[in-house]
Amino acid sequence: MDNELRRIRAIAEYQFGPGSGMALFPDEVRMVYSRNTGRIRHIHLGDALIATFRPNDGVFTLTIAAAEHLLAKAPEFGYTVTVTEDAAQFVSQGKNVFAKHVLSAGEKIRPGDEVIIVAEKSGVVGVGKALLISDEMKAFKIGVAVKTRRGSETDA
């Protein structure tokens, strides 16, 4: 097995928990390297960009394609935030998630974690960075819970 593939799977396991490395990065992934540093920058599955490696903190940012792929392979994924259908239309346009619209959140979520935003009925609507722990997301009625990085309608 390729050392780089083992490395990105290990990072995913650290970031998202056991089993996520293989679920997110199967053997068919293709890595794109930075021209300046020669390090991994983007990971593609087929023609779709699924993750970008952030060298400043050593973790991945996900795309909508990665979120859908990950939830299909690992439905018990612990880094999901479920929002109301009313909020889902705005989140899919790239708007932030407010705490009052959060129905449930994975117990492992901490501020700064990469999370998948799902609507209660319509599936993945975005990905972003958690700003609160999971208990606060469910308890608070004001404030931003997740800073949306990509909405399902805005992700190209």
Predicted regions and their residues:
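Beta-strand/loop-dominated core regions that host nucleotide or nucleotide-derived cofactor-binding catalytic loops
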Residues: R6-V29, R35, L45-P111, V115-A156
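Terminal interaction modules at protein C-ends
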Residues: R39-I40
